[in-house]
Design a protein with these regions (language model features):
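Hydrophobic, well-ordered beta-alpha structural blocks that scaffold small-molecule cofactor pockets
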Residues: 1-44, 48-56
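Phosphate-bearing ligand-interacting subdomains
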Residues: 37-98
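Cofactor-binding loop segments of dinucleotide-utilizing enzymes, especially the Rossmann-like FAD-
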Residues: 10, 33-34, 69, 94, ...
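Structural signal for interior beta-strand "rungs" in well-ordered beta-sheet cores
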Residues: 92-208
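Short active-site oxyanion
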Residues: 3-6, 28, 61-65, 180
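Short amphipathic alpha-helical segments
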Residues: 18-20, 76-80, 124-125, 196
């Protein structure tokens, strides 16, 4: 029997993820969003973001996915739902993504987009976004609530801590440790550990704020 799926967030991030839903597993029923709208892309907005729990409790919905790009907001919503309904949070993985070792998926709320590559022995934890064409190489650990943008490259044996944003076409060389709450700008090349949260840009990447 197919599960009834709703998205938390009705915006461009939801539009990017929706085509990857497996129609054999899920019936999409609508959105929850704080904007003053009643529908999005032909589906109803069922309530505000924090109105979702009664729907899970009464069985109106039995699968959810958080479609908000901002790491901090996505983390807040994930923890709100996961407290009582962790098992209702699904993973959405494109059939065109390549995940070399199935045990790399170590949590829930994970999105892996078209053409992404997840190397051997990688560990992806809760509520991570791995966008189109991103590459995460062998033995790298990505803690929860991160966002890896399109065509970003994280080389092997890295450790990416919580709430990191890795910008489009940026590169993190092998064996580095990246502090939580770090933003790496598009096209940056990170060549040493980042021990202090902030925004890093350029080649080599340097902190700007």
């Amino acid at each position: 029997m197919k599960k009834k799926l709703a998205f938390l967030g009705a915006g461009s991030h939801a539009d990017a993820i929706a085509p990857v839903i497996d129609p054999l597993l899920y019936d999409f029923v609508g959105f929850f969003d704080d904007k003053d709208i009643t529908e999005h892309d032909g589906y109803p907005v069922l309530g505000k973001l924090y109105d979702v729990l009664p729907y899970l409790e009464d069985g109106s919905i039995d699968a959810v996915f958080i479609t908000i790009g901002d790491n901090a907001k996505r983390k807040e919503l994930f923890e709100y739902v996961a407290k009582d309904y962790y098992d209702f949070i699904i993973n959405i993985i494109s059939p065109n993504a390549l995940v070399l070792t199935p045990d790399s998926i170590c949590g829930r709320g994970i999105f892996i987009g078209f053409g992404a590559f997840i190397g051997s022995k990688v560990k992806l934890f809760d509520n991570n976004v791995v966008n189109t064409g991103a590459l995460i190489e062998h033995h790298t650990v990505v803690e929860s609530h991160c966002n890896i943008a399109p065509n970003a490259t994280i080389n092997g044996l890295c450790y990416i801590r919580e709430e990191v944003y890795v910008g489009s076409a940026s590169v993190i060389i092998q064996t580095l440790d990246i502090s939580s709450c770090t933003t790496i700008g598009a096209g940056a090349v990170v060549v040493k550990d980042i021990i202090e949260p902030g925004t890093y840009v350029g080649v080599p990447a340097k902190k700007i704020k």
